[in-house]
């Protein structure tokens, strides 16, 4: 492949360890392969704003590794139903699934080219229990079992997302947000904080919040 991006596995291992994670061989290969594919197709599809695999790791992929650790602290079923709404180019989803493979994880993406890229990435490095749905979330949610976990990076403003998914959560279901800010002091009525985590990156501090309905809506 002309102009193929090559990710140094040695350097990637070093970056993972610096962030506090010891990558397994399978996890390392999945993340490296994803970065190579992402940066190659980024030239024509404008998938992400970064231009080198190193910058992409430090600004985007590292969030997925921290997210995997955060999800392990949450009270989830052994095999949760997980929705990644507005999955885009697969961040956080694909690196997350390289590190955290519980349950059934569906990346929902309405844009055809991005959904095509997600399928291409999974065809190159299959990840257990990981799927792509091309279409609008409104069409996806009624067709699935209720979600134990919804993940959102920038699908829609957080208050709107809570309203959007509230009728589709399983008992004990949670919505996890990736944010640059701490969880707001005031939440919509009927919602509570399950957990919050601050973590550091080369780009500064970032947050995860997990919110849950106090009473699951009917």
Swiss-Prot record:
| Top enzyme class | transferase
Tell me where it resides: Cytoplasm
Q: Which InterPro entries match?
A: rRNA_ssu_MeTfrase_G, SAM-dependent_MTases_sf
What Enzyme Commission number(s) does the record list for this chain?
2.1.1.170
Q: Name one GO molecular function term.
A: rRNA (guanine-N7-)-methyltransferase activity
Q: Which reaction does it catalyse?
A: guanosine(527) in 16S rRNA + S-adenosyl-L-methionine = N(7)-methylguanosine(527) in 16S rRNA + S-adenosyl-L-homocysteine
Q: What are the record's GO terms for cellular component?
A: cytosol
Which annotated residues bind S-adenosyl-L-methionine? 86, 91, 137-138, 153
Q: Which UniProt keywords apply?
A: Cytoplasm, Methyltransferase, rRNA processing, S-adenosyl-L-methionine, Transferase
The protein's job, in short, is: Specifically methylates the N7 position of guanine in position 527 of 16S rRNA.
Family note: Belongs to the methyltransferase superfamily. RNA methyltransferase RsmG family.
Q: Indicate what this protein is called per its UniProt record.
A: Ribosomal RNA small subunit methyltransferase G
């Amino acid at each position: 492949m002309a102009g193929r991006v090559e990710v140094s596995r040695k350097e990637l291992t070093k970056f993972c360890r610096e962030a506090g994670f010891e990558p397994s061989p399978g996890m390392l290969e999945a993340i490296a392969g994803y970065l190579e594919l992402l940066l190659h197709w980024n030239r024509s599809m404008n998938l992400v704003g970064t231009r080198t695999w190193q910058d992409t790791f430090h600004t985007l992929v590292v969030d997925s590794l921290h997210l995997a650790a955060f999800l392990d602290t949450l009270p989830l079923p052994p095999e949760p139903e997980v929705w990644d709404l507005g999955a885009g180019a697969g961040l956080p989803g694909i690196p997350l699934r390289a590190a955290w493979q519980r349950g059934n994880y569906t990346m929902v993406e309405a844009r055809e080219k991005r959904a095509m890229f997600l399928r291409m990435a999974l065809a190159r490095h299959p990840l257990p229990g990981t799927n792509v749905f091309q279409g609008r979330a409104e069409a996806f949610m009624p067709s699935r079992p209720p979600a134990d976990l919804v993940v959102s990076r920038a699908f829609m403003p957080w208050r709107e997302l809570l309203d959007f998914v509230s009728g589709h959560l399983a008992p004990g279901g949670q919505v996890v947000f990736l944010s640059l800010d701490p969880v707001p002091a005031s939440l919509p009525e009927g919602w509570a904080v399950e957990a919050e985590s601050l973590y550091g990156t080369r780009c500064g501090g970032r947050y995860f919040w997990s919110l849950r309905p106090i009473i699951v809506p009917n």
